[in-house]
């Protein structure tokens, strides 16, 4: 084998190892961090959804690691509130699109600004139109999503023992 072919094979091997590593890293995540962000809710402050009823971008300056994932907050007060009661503020279904979970699948693509708080729980959705539909039909859709979540989690091949208790009704 020529030196050039060995170099090509080496580069291809490293590329494949990188892809496999990326897949296994995302499969081990306990929280939806999107494709590239590595941070929960794409860096938005989970507490602000409840205190300000809007999506507010957090800061790395006010971060806290929970379930192996960094969470960002707009200020130290929000970070402290989350640290004291994280279950109160985390999005349902691991931060995956609640509308997709209803259908038995997931997309990591959620719009942090397309959210609904229903019965004191945060639901992230793919887009605003679907968020409005989800909220308008919550009595039907939330139980379906909740029933589908264990199946969807299994499809993700993610070991998330903490989500079992967090997202139980």
Task: Describe these PLM feature segments.
Residues 25-169:
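Charged, low-complexity intrinsically disordered segments
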């Amino acid at each position: 084998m020529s030196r050039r072919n060995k170099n090509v094979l080496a580069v291809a091997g490293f590329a494949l190892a990188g892809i496999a590593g990326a897949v296994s890293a995302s499969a081990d995540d306990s929280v939806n961090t999107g494709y590239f962000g590595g941070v929960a809710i794409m860096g938005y402050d989970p507490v602000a959804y409840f205190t300000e009823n809007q999506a507010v971008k957090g800061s790395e300056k006010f971060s806290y690691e929970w379930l192996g994932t960094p969470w960002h907050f707009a200020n130290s007060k929000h970070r402290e509130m989350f640290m004291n009661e994280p279950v109160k503020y985390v999005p349902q279904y691991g931060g995956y699109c609640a509308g997709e979970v209803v259908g038995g699948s997931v997309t990591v693509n959620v719009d942090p600004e397309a959210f609904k708080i229903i019965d004191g729980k945060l639901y992230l959705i793919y887009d605003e139109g679907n968020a409005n539909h989800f909220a308008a039909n919550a009595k039907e859709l939330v139980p379906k999503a909740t029933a589908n979540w264990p199946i969807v989690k299994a499809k993700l091949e993610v070991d998330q023992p903490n989500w079992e208790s967090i997202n139980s009704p």
